[in-house]
Amino acid sequence: MKKIKFFSSFQDEEKWLEQMAADGYKLAKRNTLQTLIYTFVPAPPEQVCIRADYRVFKTQHDFQDYCTLFEDSGWYHIAGTKDSGNQYFKRIDENSNEDIFSDTPSRAERYKRLSNNAFACCFFFVPLIFGGLMILNLDAFLNPRALWVTPGLWESETNFMWWRAFLFEMPFALMRGYVAPFMIFLSTTFTLFYLFIMAKSRKIYRMMLNADTD
């Protein structure tokens, strides 16, 4: 079962995942790049303590050491990969602490890591926006013929040579007129989404640090 959810707070996400576990749905996967898709599998209902972290690892060995460290402390890694960022743990030892973080600064650091990674994701989409703008042809919305730039195409007689030129250029014409606007829209949407995550996470990070010093 897949569910689409967005959380700006790890605490709210943890509570929701615990409720899903109580309803008989175990978290199996959270998509990468901070997307909103959670994958669950049916499981016996259980009252469980779930905690979330955010880390990206350079090597698989570092990731495995990270999971092992938590497991030795009574927390089992239930979802997340080396590159996914979002990491989820279930408490398996009732004698372990109720949190995977020892203090507020370390708990706040996950928001800083999330903010930095969201900002980095923006750089993937910005070139796509500029690339789309470079090939965009606004005249196409009023005059679709303008998408075909072969000289004299529309003044030529409709014959075999005309159809060959028309069909040959069609993929490029569609890209200029329709793929480019879609690419610009999609890339802009993702860029704004990641900028929002960056700003929101940075704000929570600062609030947590300020609250800890008061």
Short names for language-model regions:
Residues 1-214:
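Terminus-proximal functional modules
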